[in-house]
Each structure stands twice: as C-alpha cells, then as structure tokens.
Amino acid sequence: MNDNPATDKVFKEVSSLYKQYFEYAILVRKWLEIPDDLSHREIGYGMLKKVDNRNMSFNTERDYLAWVLKESPFHLYKSLSYMEYPDIVGGAAKKGLFKREVAFDIDTHKTEKCTHDDSWICEECLGEARNQVLILIEDFLFPDFGLDEKDLKIVFTGNRGYHIYLKPEDPELLKRIEKWGKNERRYFIEYILGKNLNLRNMGSRWKNILVREFNKNKIATKKFEKTSDWKTEIDNRKDTTRRTIYETIDKVKSRLELDEKVMDDDIRLLRTIGSLHGYTGLMVKEITYNSLKNNQFDPLNHGVFSKFHKKMYNVKIKQELDPLTLKGDTFDHNSTEIPASYLLFLFGHGIDFEILE
C-alpha cells in the first residue's frame, strides 16, 4: 500500500477483517443481499474511496457471491435501476434503463446537541436520523400514499442515516412506481420537502402538518383550518406573528435531510444490505418499522458485528479523538486495548494509529 510498515499492517488487518465478515455473512448467515434480477443490476464497490469501481454485472448469484468473497470490498453497492446493459460505461440511455427502485436516503449531520467532530457519530445524531425516518413515514408515506409498514423496506446505512425503499405488496402499484421517470420522482420528493408549497392553495396534508406545528408555537389556527388561502390569512396578522408563522413554515420544510440526488439520479447506487460501511465498520442492516418506532434498534449496539467486538487489539492512537460508544463500551484516544469493531471505525475515519505486537 505504501512504504510505512505500520500503515501496511493496519490495512492488511482491516482487509482480513472484511474478508472474515463476508465469509460469515455469506456462507454462514446468508446476510448479504443478492439484488433481485441480478443480471440487470449494476454493481459498484470501493476500498479506500466510496466508489472506486462500478459498471460491473454478474449473470449468476454464484458468480456474484464468489466475487464478493474474493474481493471483500469495504464499500459495496448495487444500482437502484434495472438495465439491459449494466456493465456499459455511460448514462441511463446507454445502459438501457427499463425500471428503477424508488428509495429515500436520509443522511443527517451533527445536531446542536452533538459535542463531537463533524465526521463522528453519537446517539444524538443517530437519534435525529431515526426521528426523520418516522416523520417521512408517518407524515407522508402512510397518510398521503396509503402505504403501511409492509410496503416499506427500512435499512440502516451503517452511518448517520437510513434508506427507505418503497416496496408495495400490491404488484400493480409496485410496477407503476418502478416505472416512474425522473420527473415523477422529482415531483414526489419536492412535495415531501414542501418545495412547491402554495400558500394561496394549501393542500390538506401540509395544512394538517403546519396546523400542528402552529399549535406548538401558540399560533391561533382556527382560521387556517377553514381556508386554503393561507397567504391572505398570514398577511392579515401582526408583523411579529407573521414573522413567527413564516419561520415555523421554513423550519417544518427543512426537517428532513433527504439526499435529493438519490431520487433524481437515474443510475444511482445504494449500499448493499448485509455489507459493512467502509467508514464505520457498522453493518448495513434491514430493520422493521416497529423496531424503529419503539426505539428498539440501537445502531451503536445492533449495528456492530458482535464477533468483531470480541476480537481485541493492542494499539497506540496518535491523535486526540472524541469518545465513541459501541455496544456499551466507550473508547477514545486514551484507549490502548480496543475491539476490531472500533479499529474499523478508526481506519475508516483516517485516524493515525498503530497496531502493537
């Protein structure tokens, strides 16, 4: 890798850990997702970068799994799109896109309560990601689109976010959704983000959401509930009230940190379920709506590959770090004995450390 023996040693050990994980995930537990209609899906992967290589495809599950076991990539992806020629370099037209999964990507940043560096994670920012998933589902996907929990696939990304796939049980509805083009997907996400909100003609869903928030801010809502022309009603309020109303609307519209490119890009790749996230070493893991709703899923516990939390290393960490808690154990730059789970996190974040004999 380079001329530094200590760095080489770390890289080789990390590579070995990823190989051990995939052998267990594939051969023992069958955790790794095999994208449906595999031969029409593009595969991408990365080692030191998110995506070093893409435009790959496999005709059989056997070939795909054999490749994953051999390469054991730090980052593993599949395309949302189904294509006639997934291994051709180029855009959707060259690849022959004929349908596409619809998925949301919630990717939160550090919150005001986080005390760590921007790239670190903690219970606060992970909790914010959870809250945003519930807002998306309960304020929009369930009431507006008639979906229920059986129609969704929720995946912890292995970092500060979740992927939410629309997978209706109704085959005709699924077929229609997967035939959506870029314009339909764009309209869908812009509606949820309130980008086309028309205060002269308020729809019922956004009206209900905003009335609820107005009540929290002690803004009288009776007249808003009876009219769709909110612009006129707002303009009739006092300056301070009017300012509070607009601030509340802007705050509600910015609640969701949705990656719009995931909805917009025809040939977007998403992380493969059952792989590891190369920046954190945490599992890309499918979870249930109820486990999220009832706060039963703890990413810093259930997202850790348990076998890696039992494999210990003596290390020397050469820079100051914010604390990180994995499976109830807290580590920082003063830690001298750490599990493989924390070692992968350090490596993924480019931390300067050395494995000791």
Curated annotation (Swiss-Prot):
Active-site residues?
105, 107, 259
Top-down, what is the taxonomic lineage of the species of origin? Archaea, Methanobacteriati, Methanobacteriota, Methanomada group, Methanococci
- The top EC class, named as a word, is transferase
Q: Which SUPFAM superfamilies does this one have?
A: Prim-pol domain
Describe the subunit structure. Heterodimer of a small subunit (PriS) and a large subunit (PriL).
Hey, which family's this protein in?
A: Belongs to the eukaryotic-type primase small subunit family.
**Which InterPro entries does the record cross-reference, listed alphabetically?**
DNA_primase_S, DNA_primase_ssu_euk/arc, DNA_primase_ssu_PriS
| Gene Ontology biological-process annotations | DNA replication, synthesis of primer
Tell me which EC number(s) this protein carries: 2.7.7.-
Return the protein name: DNA primase small subunit PriS
Cited function:
Catalytic subunit of DNA primase, an RNA polymerase that catalyzes the synthesis of short RNA molecules used as primers for DNA polymerase during DNA replication. The small subunit contains the primase catalytic core and has DNA synthesis activity on its own. Binding to the large subunit stabilizes and modulates the activity, increasing the rate of DNA synthesis while decreasing the length of the DNA fragments, and conferring RNA synthesis capability. The DNA polymerase activity may enable DNA primase to also catalyze primer extension after primer synthesis. May also play a role in DNA repair.
Cofactor(s) the record lists: Mg(2+); Mn(2+)
The terms under GO molecular function for this entry are: DNA-directed RNA polymerase activity; metal ion binding
Q: Which domain of life is it from?
A: Archaea
Which gene produces this protein?
priS
Q: Which GO terms describe its cellular component?
A: DNA-directed RNA polymerase complex; primosome complex
- What are the entry keywords? DNA replication, DNA-directed RNA polymerase, Magnesium, Manganese, Metal-binding, Nucleotidyltransferase, Primosome, Transcription, Transferase
